[in-house]
Amino acid sequence: MKSFLAPLFSRVEIHQYFRPMKSRMESAYQERLKHRFASLEKKFHLGYNRRIELLDEIFGRENVNIHKYDATEFPGGDVVAHFLSALDLPVEQSALSQSYNEGLSLPAVQLLYVYRKFNPSLTPADRAIVKQLSHMPGDPFRFHSALYHELLANGPNAVFLFEQRVGFSITENLTADDAIGIRSEQDLAEIPQQSLRWLSDTLSRPGGTTVVPPADADLSAVAALVASLHEPG
């Protein structure tokens, strides 16, 4: 990237955002599921500190600006507004992002997980399915702190070295969401009745077909209903 930009500009500045690690891991797992089946056996190598070392080496530390990705610290909760402000550029309403991506709810991730068990590869219908699932209410998707520690592959000093370089903390209250956090793939496969009713209500047509929800143990039938979410109403 530097070799491409250097002839065009006298100076190149880098602005990069980093989430706290547990939040990043939860977001990354959802993204994996959106594209393919993802087990909870594959560890997460987040490599925050190494990434910054590479940026410092290539662009020069004085040209590398690191920001914490935290919507509560952005003007109006908008990352685009924060980025423009960091560049001392006027914030035009038309330039702001239209919505803040909060991710899928826990019930939506559970349904997506079951769908992926039987449809492990990306299909043309997947984007429409994920869009439908994005409207599903419920608790936010969170990892239990024990699962987070199990999946994190970073070295013991990774967070310290990162925070020392960037000047802000990415430390989280790792147990804050343990009451709703998943511990294993078994938790993902336990589809509650409320989620089955949501599937039934979403797929049933007024004056037409009424979809009867399957038994919660019949995961193949649940996956088939999730696959039907791409069909127009």
PLM features: residue spans?
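Anion-recognition interface
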Residues: 1-233
